[in-house]
Design a protein with these regions (language model features):
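Conserved phosphate/anionic-ligand binding catalytic regions in large, soluble enzymes, centered on
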Residues: 14-35, 329-347, 388-395
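A glycine-rich helix N-cap at a beta->alpha junction
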Residues: 69-85
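Alpha-helical support elements that line or immediately flank enzyme active sites
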Residues: 26-41, 163, 345-356, 400-408
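Phosphate-handling active-site elements
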Residues: 37-49, 77-82, 351-365, 406-417
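Functionally critical mobile loop/hinge segments
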Residues: 86-100, 107, 403-518
Length: 518
């Protein structure tokens, strides 16, 4: 299944705010569980079966908190719930029966999750949803009805015959976006009176899915452009900087004004700061292959025992700290993914060290988000589809544009910086040891921050990436997909890259024996 949605800067690129370690394998599944909770009358079920196909990475069941995420969502939790790490224990305490079954069923996407629910009213409801990358989700199927929903609106689901569906349409004031002879789905910008729908004659059951995102998708939401080339054409007509373009883009999608957009950007910076501190204070929860080291790195930097790399030392500490927080299932921001959550905070810390103000760095975050939207709109943010370049590479590319903007670069320079950074990491394999977002993901975030800073400086100096930015995205995505199609991604075989080494195989076997199903 290809992505057909236009990115929202906060819903899909700089967000969600989530507990780690993975946006595709933790945050997305949590949202899938939560949407199913809504679909089933706010968790009005006596049993739910989680099904992972053997054709998905989820069937391995260890290291990325997928089942913890789904289970938390099924209890009504969102991806930022502070107790997500303990969701399996909480579910047991509440007496919830949520078995996991591995099937051989074909699936539309490698990140597909099927949930089969038995409600207290005697109904059975099944859902098939997809974690699209970066915490974004798609509702693919409800019972036997194929749908295309993305969790950003109020979706009213009505079980009933054609007369009941017609009555619901009259009450809700809009036609269904999907229907068959016994089920219809209505999509709204505003919350519906679900009790009124349930009381309609002929309605067997009705429920409402709630948007689990900061920005509810409007009825007539439309970005003024969706690609880098489109932005440049828009600027040729309207003028303005790349920051002005970011404001115009997000306003078109969400309806938010500039103040509200800036306020949220500043809020995201606050969360990133909290993530850095949580990483520095890390107790090692959730680690398997390595131990937390960001605090030691900070001490070495402060004692000047690093090679003198200036602000790169600051970036290294911050990026590593965020990823160690992420690995412990503590709060981070998918920027654009959980696996790359440390890259932008690393660059932001370096920019702060260089003397830029909070407001300036918040502006640069919006520039980064806009560049990330171009990747989302033309490629993906999930390494299981496009390799590591769509995560670490994307984050580094976004951060390079942000740094170039604060250095005084115009739109061309910002895009050149983004292009250089992404080209540098095109072809980066997704070959984690064992599973999860630990090795090499933590290390690569620091590298991604450094690559962003170097690329920004190169672009300011006039280095030409030659390819337009949209073509850099295309090249990266095509190459990454080809690698994935040959099983060079995310440990699907466990015999490629670092996974194929003697140590890689040993670590994988130990992990399979010792790590809990999560």
């Amino acid at each position: 299944m290809e992505n057909t949605k236009t990115a929202d800067l906060f819903n899909d690129v700089m967000g969600p705010i989530m507990c780690g370690p993975s946006s595709s394998s933790t945050a997305g599944p949590t949202r899938i569980g939560r949407l199913t909770y809504d679909l089933c009358g706010q968790g009005d079920y006596k049993k739910v079966v989680i099904e992972y196909s053997s054709h998905t990475g989820y069937s391995h069941g260890r290291g990325s908190g997928t089942t913890k995420g789904v289970t938390g969502g099924l209890m009504g939790w969102m991806p930022d719930h502070e107790n997500l790490f303990y969701s399996l224990d909480v579910a047991k305490e509440r007496g919830l029966d949520i078995p996991v079954v591995i099937t051989e069923d074909p699936v539309p996407h490698v990140n597909t999750i099927t949930l089969k629910c038995s409600l207290n009213n005697g109904m059975d409801i099944s859902t098939r949803m997809i974690s699209m990358g970066g915490g974004s989700v798609a509702v693919y199927q409800i019972d036997d009805l194929r749908v295309d929903l993305f969790g950003g609106r109020y979706e009213v689901v009505v079980w009933g015959d054609s007369a009941a569906q017609a009555a619901a349409q009259a009450l809700l004031g809009r036609a269904p976006v999907a229907q068959n002879d016994h089920l219809a789905v209505f999509s709204r910008e505003e919350e519906a009176d679900i009790d009124a729908v349930r009381n309609l004659s002929g309605v067997r059951y009705a429920s409402q899915l709630y948007p689990g995102v900061p920005c509810v998708t409007r009825d007539y939401a439309q970005a003024p452009f969706t690609t880098a080339a489109g932005m440049q054409a828009w600027q040729a007509e309207h003028g303005g900087s790349i920051l002005d373009a970011a404001f115009a883009y997000q306003s078109g999608i969400s309806g938010w004004d500039q103040k509200r957009i800036m306020d949220w950007s500043l809020h995201l910076l606050d969360v990133m700061d909290q993530s850095v501190q949580a990483g520095l204070d890390n107790d090692g929860r959730g680690f398997f292959c390595v131990r937390p080291v960001s605090h030691a790195l900070k001490e070495l930097h402060e004692k000047k025992k690093f090679l003198d790399t200036g602000i790169l030392g600051v970036a290294t500490v911050a990026a590593t700290a965020v990823m160690e927080s992420n690995m412990s299932m503590r709060l981070v921001i998918a920027a654009p993914t959980g696996g790359s959550a440390g890259v932008f905070p690393g660059v932001a810390a370096a920019l702060a060290e260089a003397g830029y103000t909070r407001e300036q760095i918040a502006e640069s975050l919006l520039v980064a988000a806009l560049v990330g939207a171009f990747i989302y709109n033309q490629a993906t943010f999930t390494a299981s589809v496009g390799g590591c370049a769509v995560e670490i590479g994307a984050a580094s590319s976004m951060s390079a544009a942000a740094a170039a903007y604060l250095l005084g670069g115009d739109t061309k320079v910002c895009l050149d910086a983004a292009g250089l950074a992404l080209r540098n990491l095109t072809g980066l394999a997704c070959d984690p040891l064992a599973s999860g977002v630990e090795v090499p993901c933590i290390h690569r975030n620091a590298m991604g921050s450094a690559n962003a800073i170097v690329s920004a400086n190169m672009a300011l100096g006039g280095v030409d990436p030659v390819l337009p930015y949209d073509e850099v995205i295309e090249a990266m995505y095509v190459f990454g997909k080809n690698c994935v199609d040959n099983n060079w991604a995310c440990g699907r075989i466990g015999r490629v890259g670092a996974q194929g080494t003697a140590t890689g195989q040993r670590v994988r076997e130990e992990f399979s024996r010792k790590a809990p199903m999560d």
